């Protein structure tokens, strides 16, 4: 049985969906004002694996990952670039989808945009006002009255008393309590705005996810996920809004992925250690990035360095090399009673334990290398596929390259043929020179009875 760590209860729990055989899951997606960075890759890949495992476990999964397409950062960046917010949003969504494809992400069931749900946001805010949980201010904003929601702080542990005692909160004369947060922002000149009972304006960030999740999954659903930085205030405020509006539990299980640090420090532009997915893709294959993320447990912090990415590349190369040269039988699906598959399943059923599952893949690859058994190789490929790995032909991965200055496959084959000709002519010096040239270019040759095969180092 699947168990998962629930941030809400701070413990592992057996997973019991609201509706047997079906899972409803919402994950906070991108605010589309800039390219996705490696931290976003962690979240995207982590919840993609969770989605895949739920599907592999036989569940019918309704997976919703939103797009925040109206927000202060979007307006500011569009102004800086001299384009409209709409132009920036469309450009950034296209970039995001290219990055998602490079990481091998499955598309979510639904990918709603905030601007398509403003009417629902207005309706929820009206309900919150009617329930005494929110109030319009004189400046045209609408605020959530946090003191009116008894359970505030239950997700993050940051209760109102702790917040007032431990954090400096800027006083705003429009708020009844400095900790109240905005649900609706009054329109400012030149900014996108919508009509509402409180005048023209736009929704606050937190209300967007409450409305989009409930629209697609209902007022009470199974799983809500996101990065651990969203626990507070975003997810805490989502709970206050949704439960304040509907009067019952919003989400049963809250999942949060850990951060990616760069050389042991938090990634930030000011430290000069900020990497977009595009930056990393210039040097590493997208599947290598995915493997780097997947081989660590989703809740653990992960350190990013070039040497660690190179180690991930070598690890994935080992797995693909085990499949090389074996004609695989057609897959009949995974037999979960097989010893390796059963261990893989036990790891994944324990809070999506990908690090242990990857260890099983390496053990299985070692067995395949020894036996060259097509059935074991098929199992290796199928189990890897559950994690979104090993989905390509081994030759495509092993001989594919990224980065400038690398030899093309055609150039490598031509040099291998020249080396073969030199060996046939017993010109050993030329043969060695060509091998050394290929080695210097990162090409590994393996001579065997069937000829020479190659891969990139």
Curated annotation (Swiss-Prot):
Renumbered ranges of motif 'KMSKS' region: 266-270
Swiss-Prot/TrEMBL cofactor(s): Zn(2+)
Free-text comment on the cofactor: Binds 1 zinc ion per subunit.
Compartments, as annotated in UniProt: Cytoplasm
The keyword Cytoplasm is annotated on this UniProt entry: yes
Transmembrane parts of this sequence: none
Recorded family membership: Belongs to the class-I aminoacyl-tRNA synthetase family.
NCBIfam families listed in its UniProt record: cysS
Name used for this protein in its record: Cysteine--tRNA ligase
Organism (species): Chromobacterium violaceum (strain ATCC 12472 / DSM 30191 / JCM 1249 / CCUG 213 / NBRC 12614 / NCIMB 9131 / NCTC 9757 / MK)
Origin organism lineage: Bacteria, Pseudomonadati, Pseudomonadota, Betaproteobacteria, Neisseriales
Gene giving rise to this polypeptide: cysS
